[in-house]
Amino acid sequence: MNAPKILILKFSALGDVVHTLPIAATIRKSLPDSYIAWMVEERYQDILAGNPDIDEVIPLRTKVWRKNWNSKSLGEILNTIKTLRRQNFDLVLDLHGLLKSGVIAGLSGASTRVGFHRKNCKEKINTLFTNRKAPHMTKGLHVVDMTLTLLQTALGKVEEAKLFPL
């Protein structure tokens, strides 16, 4: 894979986003010329802003959309989808295993959408939207190890970055 455009889907929560930061550093170490975008809930975007391993932070406003559902919300959702599709991502890494992350992965237009094994998804329906699955992982495996396994499903063997910026 030559300088791929990669979209990471990990929207929330604060601790989960922090725990998955090593994936961006590992991608950057393995594919230094890749373009890495990360979609995250708007209220957590500052955690990722300025991270040298992430080229773009795409804020998501699902909490706002749910609270104030109206035609403006629908317009914002459609614009978000259009923006994603225009990016022409090669690879999406769905680190959630939820319906909403699966739908976004599917609507992204990326040819390769990697997610968790059905048994590791929080919402099984997610697997309908990914076309490559990480192998089943035993319960209790740390989230950092789970995301690394998912990344290896996408890219093959990668050398894990032990240090990553916060």
Where are these regions (language model features)?
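Catalytic machinery of carbohydrate-active enzymes
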Residues: 1-166
